[in-house]
Amino acid sequence: MGIIVLLVFVFCAFYVQNRGAVQHVKLVRKISDHSNIFGPINCLFYFFSKIKKSAYIDTSNFPELKTLTDNWETIRDEAISLNDAVQIKSSEQKDDLGFNSFFKTGWKRFYLKWYGASLFSANKLCPKTVNLINSIPAVKGAMFAMLPPGARLVKHRDPYAGSFRYHLGLVTPNSEECFISVDGEEYYWKDGEAVMFDETFIHFAENKTDINRIVLFLDIKRPVTFFLVDWVNEVFSRIVMAATTTRNMDGDKIGAINRLFPYIFKVRVVGKRIKKANRPAYYLLQYSVYLLIIYGIFF
């Protein structure tokens, strides 16, 4: 039985890694890609999705989101006020596992809600935006996200296919020099314009201008044709995704995973030191751990 389950994981991981036109080149990158962990559940979402496979999603599939573009200037004004108060910022406490790797590029964020209730700080500092996103049940996660001049987010795919990613341009260079590329297709942000894409395709972003880019960043629940798959999405979101909740400031709640992240980060630091000192030894250790985990789970 364990071998059958393992083969299902391998098959689903293979599909995830080869689903798009753009793929990781190195085998080691494909094997270590964290999206493989959620391969089986993601394949369920892909198979039962109401939206056909595409790098970019037509926002008209979600008419309820029109209220955001209709009120984009109101949202923009609250984002500007937050940024002026230096509240759109990186994590100061190593408590944001999901986006920790972005911070070294200068990327910053201010959470509005994350797979649960809206954050206390968001209700206090940007109530109009919070009211707007809370009026749309499909919105599972929300934040203001800033990509500063010269910043580049490396190629990656998000691990969970239970949502689509939505960006609403608030403060942008309105230039082709500030863009996102999803599965090889580029889009550049524009003030007041929304774009939606499947974040489980490989994507990256770059701001080659001297102007900050601020967008309203949302996770929109993926619609599916089978109610049990929708139920799986709800349960997974409440248990796993909600555990990655983090804070903007004191008073905000932190999910269980991010409470553990400072300790996980220390292990990662040790791993990076080993990699720097002896690369072959690092990979030997890394894959030995992978094999032990596989053996422990499936055999």
PLM features: residue spans?
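Short, solvent-exposed loop/turn segments at secondary-structure junctions
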Residues: 149, 175, 201-203, 221-223
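Short beta-strand His + acidic residue motifs that chelate non-heme Fe in jelly-roll/DSBH
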Residues: 153-156, 178-180, 197, 203-209
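A short hydrophobic beta-strand segment most commonly corresponding to one strand
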Residues: 165-170, 196, 211-226
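Conserved metal-binding segment of the jelly-roll/cupin
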Residues: 188-202
